[in-house]
Amino acid sequence: MNNVVIRTEFLCKSFGKLDVLKDISTEFYQGEVVAILGPSGSGKSTFLRCINLLEQPTKGKIYFHEQEITNPKVNIAKVRQQLVMVFQHFNLFPHMNVLQNVTYAPIKVKGINKQKAEQHGLELLESVGLEEKADVYPSKLSGGQKQRVAIARALAMEPEMILFDEPTSALDPEMVKDVLEVMKALALSGMTMAIVTHEMGFAKEVANRIMFLDQGSLAEDATPGEFFQNPKCDRAKQFLEKML
């Protein structure tokens, strides 16, 4: 059990009378790359947001290692330092340059020395191919560059797991490849990742596992080979016919 990073037990989320997540029980293992697929409105993003408690589950439990993080007494801010999220729309600070965006949280939240944080920040920007943009402000960057900065910012916290919420869906098609290449390199480095995505080729190539959500339920949990070649449920078959 000790290499399980996240475990969910009978996770439910409702908005009023709408049941968005229904009894999702699953585990994410260290070093695993899980692609979360499904039609629009199936609960994928809500599930991801529940994992680091940006959304409070209506019922059920979430464990980070053996700690129940749905317990109200848990310091959620501390947990989120280890479970960082990369959003669809980047969410960079517009009044800070690229390097300041990357180093802000390590300095303010973790108390890391500014010089050390900046050195690490420049290394991370180099790893995403943007070291020459360190002094540039977000308004001068393309969407793909902004998303790569957002990934560097997430990595600056040295997290245990990164949650990606449709990281390429707001990008122009020609920008998608650069972001996916960075994510692929991250996967190869052993980073634990959960990725809500519509990029089927990427999911097939990079993920170790596919979770397919439909109407808030975990309809299928399989290897990419099993899911793409021989999906079990009819809804997954219909989904793949449209997407591939």
Model-predicted segments: where are they?
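ABC family nucleotide-binding domain
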Residues: 3-224
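C-terminal boundary and immediately downstream tail of ABC-type ATPase nucleotide-binding domains
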Residues: 212, 221, 225-244
